[in-house]
Amino acid sequence: ATTEIYTLSLHDALPILGVTGAEKPAPARIFMHGQPTFKFAVKAVPYCIDQVLEKAVMAIEDVDFFVFHQANARIIDLAAKKYHIPPEKYYKNIQKYGNTSAASIPLVISELHDLGKVGPGSRVLVVGFGGGLTWGGALVEFA
Protein backbone atom coordinates (compact mmCIF):
# COMPACT_ATOMS: atom_id res chain seq x y z
CA ALA A 1 0.00 0.00 0.00
CA THR A 2 1.26 3.46 -0.84
CA THR A 3 1.28 5.65 2.24
CA GLU A 4 2.55 8.84 0.65
CA ILE A 5 3.16 10.13 -2.82
CA TYR A 6 4.79 13.34 -4.04
CA THR A 7 5.22 14.55 -7.60
CA LEU A 8 6.22 17.82 -9.20
CA SER A 9 6.84 19.03 -12.72
CA LEU A 10 8.74 22.12 -13.74
CA HIS A 11 7.65 21.76 -17.36
CA ASP A 12 5.09 24.57 -17.20
CA ALA A 13 7.47 26.86 -15.31
CA LEU A 14 10.34 26.64 -17.80
CA PRO A 15 10.58 28.73 -20.95
CA ILE A 16 10.43 26.83 -24.20
CA LEU A 17 13.77 27.19 -25.93
CA GLY A 18 14.83 26.41 -29.45
CA VAL A 19 11.36 26.11 -30.95
CA THR A 20 11.72 25.45 -34.64
CA GLY A 21 9.55 27.12 -37.22
CA ALA A 22 8.77 26.60 -40.88
CA GLU A 23 12.01 28.32 -41.93
CA LYS A 24 14.27 26.38 -39.59
CA PRO A 25 14.17 22.57 -39.86
CA ALA A 26 14.11 20.57 -36.65
CA PRO A 27 17.31 18.70 -35.75
CA ALA A 28 17.34 15.06 -36.82
CA ARG A 29 18.57 13.78 -33.46
CA ILE A 30 17.43 13.94 -29.89
CA PHE A 31 20.13 14.89 -27.41
CA MET A 32 20.47 15.67 -23.74
CA HIS A 33 22.54 18.28 -21.97
CA GLY A 34 24.17 15.90 -19.50
CA GLN A 35 25.74 18.29 -17.00
CA PRO A 36 22.63 20.43 -16.39
CA THR A 37 20.52 17.28 -16.17
CA PHE A 38 22.92 15.79 -13.62
CA LYS A 39 22.81 18.99 -11.55
CA PHE A 40 19.00 18.96 -11.68
CA ALA A 41 18.80 15.34 -10.49
CA VAL A 42 21.34 15.85 -7.69
CA LYS A 43 19.06 18.60 -6.30
CA ALA A 44 15.70 16.99 -7.10
CA VAL A 45 16.35 13.59 -5.49
CA PRO A 46 17.15 14.94 -1.98
CA TYR A 47 14.31 17.46 -2.23
CA CYS A 48 11.90 14.65 -3.07
CA ILE A 49 13.19 12.48 -0.21
CA ASP A 50 12.64 15.39 2.19
CA GLN A 51 9.10 15.98 0.91
CA VAL A 52 8.06 12.32 1.14
CA LEU A 53 9.47 11.95 4.65
CA GLU A 54 7.85 15.19 5.79
CA LYS A 55 4.43 14.22 4.45
CA ALA A 56 4.73 10.73 5.96
CA VAL A 57 5.98 12.18 9.28
CA MET A 58 8.95 9.82 9.19
CA ALA A 59 12.73 10.01 9.48
CA ILE A 60 15.41 8.41 7.31
CA GLU A 61 15.90 5.75 10.00
CA ASP A 62 12.24 4.65 9.65
CA VAL A 63 12.79 3.56 6.03
CA ASP A 64 13.93 -0.01 5.44
CA PHE A 65 15.14 0.43 1.86
CA PHE A 66 15.66 3.21 -0.69
CA VAL A 67 15.04 2.66 -4.39
CA PHE A 68 16.26 5.32 -6.80
CA HIS A 69 15.71 5.67 -10.54
CA GLN A 70 18.68 3.95 -12.13
CA ALA A 71 19.76 6.74 -14.50
CA ASN A 72 23.24 7.34 -13.14
CA ALA A 73 25.20 5.57 -10.39
CA ARG A 74 26.80 8.84 -9.24
CA ILE A 75 23.40 10.43 -8.60
CA ILE A 76 22.37 7.42 -6.51
CA ASP A 77 25.63 7.44 -4.56
CA LEU A 78 25.45 11.20 -3.90
CA ALA A 79 21.90 10.93 -2.54
CA ALA A 80 22.91 8.01 -0.32
CA LYS A 81 25.96 9.90 0.91
CA LYS A 82 23.96 13.06 1.68
CA TYR A 83 21.59 11.08 3.92
CA HIS A 84 24.21 8.69 5.31
CA ILE A 85 22.30 5.74 3.85
CA PRO A 86 24.47 2.63 4.20
CA PRO A 87 25.04 0.51 1.07
CA GLU A 88 22.93 -2.33 2.46
CA LYS A 89 19.85 -0.03 2.44
CA TYR A 90 19.92 0.92 -1.25
CA TYR A 91 20.54 -1.00 -4.46
CA LYS A 92 21.98 -0.33 -7.90
CA ASN A 93 21.49 -2.43 -11.00
CA ILE A 94 22.46 0.20 -13.57
CA GLN A 95 25.82 -1.55 -14.03
CA LYS A 96 23.94 -4.67 -15.23
CA TYR A 97 21.21 -3.15 -17.40
CA GLY A 98 22.03 0.50 -18.00
CA ASN A 99 19.32 3.15 -17.73
CA THR A 100 16.08 1.20 -18.11
CA SER A 101 13.99 4.38 -18.04
CA ALA A 102 10.54 4.04 -16.46
CA ALA A 103 11.17 0.36 -15.70
CA SER A 104 14.15 1.00 -13.42
CA ILE A 105 12.28 1.26 -10.11
CA PRO A 106 10.04 -1.78 -10.69
CA LEU A 107 13.08 -3.80 -11.80
CA VAL A 108 15.00 -2.90 -8.63
CA ILE A 109 12.00 -3.74 -6.43
CA SER A 110 11.61 -7.09 -8.20
CA GLU A 111 15.29 -7.91 -7.70
CA LEU A 112 15.14 -6.88 -4.03
CA HIS A 113 12.11 -9.12 -3.52
CA ASP A 114 13.87 -12.04 -5.23
CA LEU A 115 16.91 -11.47 -2.98
CA GLY A 116 14.69 -11.45 0.12
CA LYS A 117 15.64 -7.86 1.00
CA VAL A 118 12.06 -6.53 0.90
CA GLY A 119 8.82 -8.25 1.79
CA PRO A 120 5.78 -7.95 4.03
CA GLY A 121 6.13 -4.99 6.40
CA SER A 122 9.04 -3.42 4.50
CA ARG A 123 8.91 0.36 4.11
CA VAL A 124 10.55 1.40 0.86
CA LEU A 125 11.07 4.98 -0.26
CA VAL A 126 11.20 5.27 -4.05
CA VAL A 127 12.36 8.33 -6.00
CA GLY A 128 12.24 8.77 -9.76
CA PHE A 129 13.01 11.61 -12.13
CA GLY A 130 12.94 12.04 -15.86
CA GLY A 131 11.91 13.83 -18.99
CA GLY A 132 10.39 17.28 -18.75
CA LEU A 133 12.37 17.85 -15.56
CA THR A 134 9.88 15.92 -13.47
CA TRP A 135 10.38 13.91 -10.33
CA GLY A 136 8.29 11.98 -7.90
CA GLY A 137 8.51 9.81 -4.86
CA ALA A 138 6.47 7.49 -2.73
CA LEU A 139 6.75 5.64 0.52
CA VAL A 140 5.55 2.10 -0.07
CA GLU A 141 4.77 -0.34 2.72
CA PHE A 142 4.62 -3.93 1.51
CA ALA A 143 1.66 -6.01 2.68
Regions inferred by a protein language model and the residue ranges of each:
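Short, exposed "boundary/linker" segments that immediately precede the start
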Residues: A1-T7
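Hydrophobic pocket-lining "lid/loop/helix" segments that shape and contact the acyl-thioester
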Residues: L8-I94
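Claisen-condensing/thiolase-fold acyl-transfer catalytic domains that form or cleave C-C bonds
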Residues: V42, L53, D64-A143
